[in-house]
Amino acid sequence: MRITQYQTVWQLTFFPALFPVNCYLVEEENEVTLIDAALPGSYKGIIQAVNQLGKPLQHILLTHAHGDHVGSLDTLAQTFPHAKVMISERDSFLLQGDTSLRQDEPQTPIKGGIPKHIQTKPHQLLTGGETIGSLLAIPTPGHTPGSMSFLDTRNGTLIAGDAFQLRGGIAVSGQIKWAFPFPAFATWNKEEAIKSAQLLADKAPSCLAVGHGKFLRSPSERMRQAIQKAKKG
């Protein structure tokens, strides 16, 4: 596991050389929030990192319900029983293994690794606009119907799940980067992803943090370029 810090955010990267999978610890004054639960075997590194910060883990936020973002959820929820688990209302169905679409959604199939045996039940379902400590919840559908991003309002760090990727080059979810095509292959709807990417770019974040790839500081121009490329196909 590799640990990288940007201001209040700690990036934990598993398998950094081969198939980098990130989750994040966001440090508050008196507590810590975990964003995503990485892979099934990632819990040891996550627990170690939480303990190193020396503050109680109060929240576990999930950007979406793919297996490489919720893999250690059950173990972490058991280890930190006071931590409140939160996911979007929409992706809470995916967390239960339900991949059916709603009538008002684009009827493209949900892709990617959907967990089938998660036992943990969320304490709160997010719809967008909620604040969890210093984090603002932003709905960003596209990679999955209920994908959610989180903006640290203290410093502008944006934790965007798989709304963008940075491994293999920056790209909007659904835009294939052949050096690392897996996020695109797992994307539900590229058109929705482009809309969400534009919403995030309009936030003018100071740093972009995603599920796959290193921190990108001052990302606005590169985000806009990636959006234009995605629009062109």
From Swiss-Prot:
PANTHER family: METAL-DEPENDENT HYDROLASE (PTHR42951:SF9), METALLO-BETA-LACTAMASE DOMAIN-CONTAINING (PTHR42951)
KW Ion transport (keyword) present: no
Cofactor note: Binds 2 Zn(2+) ions per subunit.
Keyword entries, A-Z: Hydrolase, Metal-binding, Zinc
Family listed: Belongs to the metallo-beta-lactamase superfamily. Glyoxalase II family.
Metal-binding found in the keyword field: yes
Protein known as: Uncharacterized protein YobT
